[in-house]
């Protein structure tokens, strides 16, 4: 009898662990609907809609945390890219611009990390503020390539635009959470 009870409890616990997150997951149609409210639907569907963590997301707070994580991943990838391309920019303007981007991506990384931590605490206004600061640092990295000297093509435009678009998604989710 005791063995049957233990087996039954293990089965129910396993069932709860496996089924509970899925049963309470945010429906995929809600993610599609959210993405349709963004300025770049295919981008949103690519980065949020296909994220393997989305099926386990219970609510918009979890989706917000995933979007912040996606931003942090883009920032980290850009930082790695900076290290790879830095030697291609040996002129004074290129070196200065790469250093501005390296510094700004350091700021963005720290801000998105803290935003994620505050998102866990549901401190949404602080999340919004930090996501803006991180995004503005990335935007400045894009803009520095057009300031103070000859215009150059930024080697980080891909990452800069991804962070900018993810920021729009973060702000959209933020607005839904606070209104």
Curated annotation (Swiss-Prot):
Name the record gives this protein: Pectinesterase inhibitor 5
Stored CDD domains: PMEI (cd15797)
Single Gene Ontology BP annotation: regulation of seed germination
Gene: PMEI5
Signal peptide: 1-25
Cellular location(s): Secreted, Extracellular space, Apoplast
UniProt entry keywords in alphabetical sequence: Apoplast, Disulfide bond, Secreted, Signal
Keyword Disulfide bond: yes
GO cellular component terms given for this protein: apoplast
Keyword Signal: yes
Database matches in PANTHER family: PECTINESTERASE INHIBITOR 5-RELATED, PECTINESTERASE INHIBITOR-LIKE
Gene Ontology MF term list: pectinesterase inhibitor activity
Protein family membership: Belongs to the PMEI family.
SS bonds (residue pairs): 35-44, 101-141
Main location: secreted
Function: Pectin methylesterase (PME) inhibitor that targets PME from seeds and modulates PME activity and pectin methylesterification during seed germination.
Tissue: Expressed in seeds, buds, and mature flowers.
